[in-house]
Amino acid sequence: MTRINVGIPPAELFLCIVLVEHREIKRIPNCVAKGKYNMDGMPERFKLGTGHVKFFYNKLLYLKKRYVRLYEECIERGFNVQNYIEAWNDIPAELMNDYNVRANDIRIIRERINERLSK
């Protein structure tokens, strides 16, 4: 599983969530850089579950920007985390696209966070 808390500012997330996302977000560009990705069946809209990682294969600029915010938030909170920004090196230019977050994306993520925290 790879957690991407789309549209939620890292400053609003609990520390454990920020640290996990910081660690996991780099999986997607690493996968793409190694050529271990397939665009078949890529969802048109953000979702959780099957296909949620594929959704980001052509939105790697969005993930890079999000990663920078996550990294900065970790540092701001006093954590000594490794900077994985180099994971976005060697990404094909056609996959380095941004993404405009939709209100429904945020709703989906907030519901998932609340569900996880209530357990």
Mark where each language-model region is.
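Extended, charge-rich alpha-helical interface modules
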Residues: 1-119
